[in-house]
């Protein structure tokens, strides 16, 4: 900011002096050696801008402006690079809450699916056992009918263990 203010002040001083000069004045005053003027600071050391080539002034101002623009661009690039690096470094904190939410939702879905699976397995097993009970009941009824219609059991008073 200070460099920009310094340049704008320098430009203002140079342009004020350049407006007051006429072309004939610039051509007639040979006391300034244009080859010695290399920077804007050299221009500020002069008492007047009489005899200084306007193209030289313009070139020096453009060089300094380009220098400051380059510095500003470098600063901007550095700040953008730092910002990009900061954004690329993803902290673990950003993922903990979504991870917990995902785990809770996944476990809820799993438990719900498992409950449905158990219920279906229970119903299937219940149907199988009901068929088994029905078949055993029919077998029992058939055996009881045969026993009722069959020969009467002998009234053997001997104990079963005596046959051994």
UniProtKB/Swiss-Prot annotation:
Lineage start: Eukaryota, Fungi, Dikarya, Ascomycota, Saccharomycotina
UniProt feature coiled coil, ranges: 121-149
Presence of keyword Mitochondrion: yes
GO cellular component, one term: mitochondrial inner membrane assembly complex
Keyword annotations from UniProtKB, A to Z: Chaperone, Coiled coil, Membrane, Mitochondrion, Mitochondrion inner membrane, Transit peptide, Transmembrane, Transmembrane helix
Identification of the protein by name: Inner membrane assembly complex subunit 17
Residues spanning the membrane: 98-118
Mitochondrial intermembrane side of membrane: 119-164
Cellular compartments annotated: Mitochondrion inner membrane
Subunit architecture: Component of the inner membrane assembly (INA) complex, composed of INA17 and INA22. Interacts with a subset of F(1)F(0)-ATP synthase subunits of the F(1)-domain and the peripheral stalk.
Function according to Swiss-Prot or TrEMBL: Component of the INA complex (INAC) that promotes the biogenesis of mitochondrial F(1)F(0)-ATP synthase. INAC facilitates the assembly of the peripheral stalk and promotes the assembly of the catalytic F(1)-domain with the membrane-embedded F(0)-domain.
Mitochondrial matrix side: 29-97
Membrane topology: Single-pass membrane protein
GO biological process: mitochondrial proton-transporting ATP synthase complex assembly
Family: Belongs to the INA17 family.
Ribonucleoprotein among keywords: no
Domain of life according to the entry: Eukaryota
Organism: Candida glabrata (strain ATCC 2001 / BCRC 20586 / JCM 3761 / NBRC 0622 / NRRL Y-65 / CBS 138) (Yeast)
Transit peptide: 1-28
Principal location listed in the UniProt entry: mitochondrion
């Amino acid at each position: 900011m200070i460099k920009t203010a310094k340049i704008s002040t320098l430009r203002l001083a140079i342009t004020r002096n350049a407006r007051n000069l006429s072309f004939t004045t610039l051509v007639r005053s040979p006391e300034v050696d244009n080859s010695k003027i290399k920077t804007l600071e050299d221009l500020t050391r002069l008492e007047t801008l009489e005899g200084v080539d306007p193209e030289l002034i313009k070139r020096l101002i453009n060089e300094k402006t380009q220098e400051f623009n380059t510095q500003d661009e470098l600063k901007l690039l550095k700040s953008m690079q730092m910002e990009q690096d900061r954004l690329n470094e993803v902290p673990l904190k950003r993922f903990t809450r979504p991870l917990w939410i995902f785990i809770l939702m996944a476990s809820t879905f799993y438990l719900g699916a498992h409950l449905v699976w158990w219920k279906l397995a229970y119903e299937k097993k219940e149907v199988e056992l009901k068929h088994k009970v029905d078949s055993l009941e029919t077998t029992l009824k058939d055996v009881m009918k045969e026993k009722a219609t069959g020969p009467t059991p002998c009234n053997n008073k001997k104990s079963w263990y005596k046959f051994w």
